[in-house]
């Protein structure tokens, strides 16, 4: 059955664009989304996760940004979060990346660092307790009790352990992050990596003064000092894999640290990054109408365009977009739109949006269902998409 093209299919949203070294066939991006389909030791469930990304790379020329991976043993603490700091992790991700490439699509692997808290049940067994007592726990600039409380939990698992972050700790993080980026690109075969300065996590916490002056003097106090960690990390990663293989994500409207200078901080960061790394693959910014910590934040008078204008091209916007807002945003020069919930519930999302087809509704109860295929690989493709595959 032929699918009738609609007027909207001529929107820039559905037109090709070059991002970094990649020639994409449209401007709809799979947004990074934590899903907990991973073993407790950080080893991804390859067959399950491969099927998920294989489904969502069903439209050739799509860019997929993965869920966040921990770059090192001291980066995290959540159970069921994937990691990429040893050969076993690399071997588990290789088939996933290959499945995406087999569908003529592209993949950037995102890395993150917790802002210092560990989940409560991290201390439930002796092996993990030894890791904590030996210093193998997430780093935080403060050494103070967790500032976020219940604001940082997944499936009710709360985090709490903090450790003061020395200059040596910071350099160690930069090294492990860089090694993980090299594993992603040269080991797993990914097209690039995304650096995560988002929603109050470690890099964001530095930039937004989430710790006051309780840190090494070189990395706290003035905005220039607070930005140093991120810029040094970016420089190290770029030197290792190339600017065109690196994207950068920010959440300029997040109020986790309630920094009164948040706007100035993000403007400073964007200008510095653009000045030092003009060929970075993209800037990825979250809109103020994001869904975060159980609440929908809608601020009509604010959007990410001011940051897009500072940055230039290419630019990815994410957070609460539907088809209409995506089409509108894509009219901006060299702008892409990332989808999270709609992409997880619609494996053929770019096809559905292009032809204005009904969308599957997501099941929020399965977002963080550990190691389960339910609500992960069982969302149906549209009949119209399946019909086109029959014709082929």
UniProtKB/Swiss-Prot annotation:
One of its GO terms (cellular component) is cytosol. Keywords: Flavoprotein, FMN, NADP, Oxidoreductase. InterPro entries: Aldolase_TIM (IPR013785), OxRdtase_FMN_N (IPR001155), Oye-like (IPR045247). GO terms for molecular function: FMN binding; NADPH dehydrogenase activity; oxidoreductase activity. It catalyses: A + NADPH + H(+) = AH2 + NADP(+). Substrate binds at residues 196, 199, 368. The keyword Oxidoreductase applies. Its EC number is 1.6.99.1. The keyword NADP applies. It holds the Pfam family Oxidored_FMN. One of its GO terms (biological process) is cellular detoxification. FMN binds at residues 34, 196, 249, 341. CDD domains: OYE_like_FMN (cd02933). Homodimer or heterodimer. Belongs to the NADH:flavin oxidoreductase/NADH oxidase family. This is Putative NADPH dehydrogenase C5H10.10. The lineage of its organism: Eukaryota, Fungi, Dikarya, Ascomycota, Taphrinomycotina.
């Amino acid at each position: 059955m032929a699918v009738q093209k609609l007027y909207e299919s001529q929107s820039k949203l559905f037109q090709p664009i070059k991002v970094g070294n990649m020639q994409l066939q449209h401007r709809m991006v799979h947004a990074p989304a934590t899903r907990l389909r991973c073993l407790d030791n950080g080893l991804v469930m390859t067959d399950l996760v491969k099927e998920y990304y294989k489904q969502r790379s069903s439209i050739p020329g799509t860019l997929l940004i993965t869920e966040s991976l921990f770059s090192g043993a001291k980066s995290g603490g959540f159970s069921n979060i994937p990691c990429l700091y040893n050969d076993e992790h690399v071997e588990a991700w290789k088939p996933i990346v290959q499945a995406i490439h087999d569908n003529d699509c592209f993949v950037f692997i995102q890395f993150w660092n917790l802002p210092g808290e560990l989940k409560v049940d991290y201390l439930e067994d002796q092996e993990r307790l030894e890791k904590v007592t030996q210093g193998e726990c997430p780093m935080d600039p403060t050494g103070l009790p967790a500032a976020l409380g219940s604001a940082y939990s997944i499936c009710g698992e709360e985090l709490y352990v903090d450790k003061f972050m020395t200059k040596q700790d910071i350099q160690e993080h930069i090294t492990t992050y860089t090694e993980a980026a090299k594993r992603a690109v040269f080991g797993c075969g990914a097209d690039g990596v995304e650096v995560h300065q988002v929603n109050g996590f470690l890099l964001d916490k530095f930039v937004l003064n989430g710790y006051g002056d309780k840190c090494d003097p070189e990395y706290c106090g003035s905005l220039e000092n607070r930005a140093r960690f991120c810029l040094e990390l970016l420089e190290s990663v770029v030197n290792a894999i190339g600017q065109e293989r690196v994207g950068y994500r920010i959440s300029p409207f997040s109020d986790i640290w309630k920094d009164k200078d948040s706007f100035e901080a993000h403007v400073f960061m964007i200008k510095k990054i653009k000045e030092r790394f003009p060929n970075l693959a993209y800037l990825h910014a979250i809109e103020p109408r994001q869904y975060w910590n159980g609440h929908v934040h809608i601020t009509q008078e604010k959007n990410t365009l001011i940051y897009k204008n500072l940055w230039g091209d290419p630019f990815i916007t994410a957070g609460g977009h539907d088809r209409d807002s995506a089409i509108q945003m894509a009219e901006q020069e060299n702008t892409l739109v990332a989808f999270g919930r709609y992409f997880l519930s619609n494996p053929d999302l770019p096809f559905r949006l292009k032809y204005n087809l009904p969308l599957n509704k997501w099941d929020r109860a399965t977002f963080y269902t550990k190691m389960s295929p339910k609500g992960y690989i069982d969302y149906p493709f549209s009949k119209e998409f399946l019909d086109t595959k029959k014709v082929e």
